[in-house]
């Protein structure tokens, strides 16, 4: 029997409760009130540091019954900084997350990266070596007005990898500007990428700008059947995300770069929220 891969983590935050760190998923719950102002990005410092096992990436997302949308973050293996959750208020007035109304989830997934000698249309090599996702650039100039949702159509079929499914995720840099991308599958016939501007400013995105990322999730992680090890809050109810079976191992020195993390210090380090370009 194969040993269960380990996710190493360190956590210390008086405003969050570590509710669960079982096989597959770590969950935090807010202990204090979080105020989200209209048309303003809210970031929640988690006091959480994590490193995935080899061949895995990490996914970070939030869930709540309140009118609040969370950026689904892809945490690259080379990222060594503190994890932070990006939230957007759906309403045009204040929203309040009272204690226990926000759950923050961290889970691992297996992935692969296609071998590309050169960029293929809008699909580009990532900014940092070893990143989970490929960069995807805009095929045209784009303007997003406050609280507007637009779709960008990509017709070029992505490179194929056996047993893996190309999936679109947003970028932390754009999420910090108030632009959230709805994660979705990129199928052979193309994909319509949905972007929503939650800010109070009209945002102009130039042609060829990196606006989302393409991640090849192992097919095991995509299912249409609910189980205790899946979540509909990532990709939606028609394609649930099922996380990898990993054990969480607490390593208090992780935040200081201990435990064999020196190999990552020359790469991404703490740049971005786990996505390149922030």
UniProtKB/Swiss-Prot annotation:
Enzyme Commission numbers on file: 3.6.1.23
Protein residues bound to substrate: 171-173, 273-274
Keyword ATP-binding: no
This protein's UniProt keywords: Hydrolase, Magnesium, Metal-binding, Nucleotide metabolism
UniProt xrefs under InterPro entries: dUTPase-like (IPR029054), dUTPase-like_sf (IPR036157), dUTPase_trimeric (IPR033704), HSV_DUT (IPR034745)
Known cofactor(s): Mg(2+)
Any one GO molecular-function label of the UniProt entry: dUTP diphosphatase activity
Record Pfam families: dUTPase
Enzyme's top EC category: hydrolase
Positions in coiled-coil regions: none
Catalytic activity: dUTP + H2O = dUMP + diphosphate + H(+)
GO terms of biological process kind: dUTP metabolic process
Protein role: Involved in nucleotide metabolism: produces dUMP, the immediate precursor of thymidine nucleotides and decreases the intracellular concentration of dUTP to avoid uracil incorporation into viral DNA.
Family membership: Belongs to the dUTPase family.
Entry protein name: Deoxyuridine 5'-triphosphate nucleotidohydrolase
Higher taxonomy: Viruses, Duplodnaviria, Heunggongvirae, Peploviricota, Herviviricetes
């Amino acid at each position: 029997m194969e040993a269960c891969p380990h996710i190493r983590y360190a956590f210390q935050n008086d405003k969050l409760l570590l509710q669960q760190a079982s096989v597959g998923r770590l969950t935090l719950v807010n202990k204090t009130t979080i105020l989200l102002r209209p048309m303003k990005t809210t970031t929640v410092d988690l006091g959480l540091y994590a490193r995935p096992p080899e061949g895995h990436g990490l996914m970070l997302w939030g869930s709540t019954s309140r009118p609040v949308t969370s950026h689904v973050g892809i945490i690259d293996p080379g990222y060594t900084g503190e994890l932070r959750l990006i939230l957007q208020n759906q309403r045009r007035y204040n929203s309040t997350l009272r204690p226990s109304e926000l759950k923050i989830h961290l889970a691992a997934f297996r992935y692969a990266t296609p071998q590309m000698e050169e960029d293929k249309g809008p699909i580009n090599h990532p900014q940092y070596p070893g990143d989970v996702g490929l960069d995807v650039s805009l095929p045209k100039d784009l303007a997003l007005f406050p609280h507007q949702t637009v779709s960008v159509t990509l017709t070029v079929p992505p490179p194929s990898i056996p047993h893996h499914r190309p999936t679109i995720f947003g970028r932390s840099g754009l999420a910090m500007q108030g632009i959230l991308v709805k994660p979705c599958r990129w199928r052979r016939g193309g994909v319509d990428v949905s972007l929503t501007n939650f800010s109070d400013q009209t945002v102009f995105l130039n042609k060829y700008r990196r606006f989302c990322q393409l991640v090849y999730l192992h097919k095991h992680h995509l299912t249409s059947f609910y189980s205790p090890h899946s979540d509909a809050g990532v990709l939606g109810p028609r394609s649930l995300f099922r996380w990898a079976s990993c054990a969480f191992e607490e390593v208090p020195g992780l935040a200081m770069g201990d435990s064999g993390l020196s190999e990552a210090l020359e790469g991404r380090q703490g740049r971005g929220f786990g996505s390149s370009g922030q």
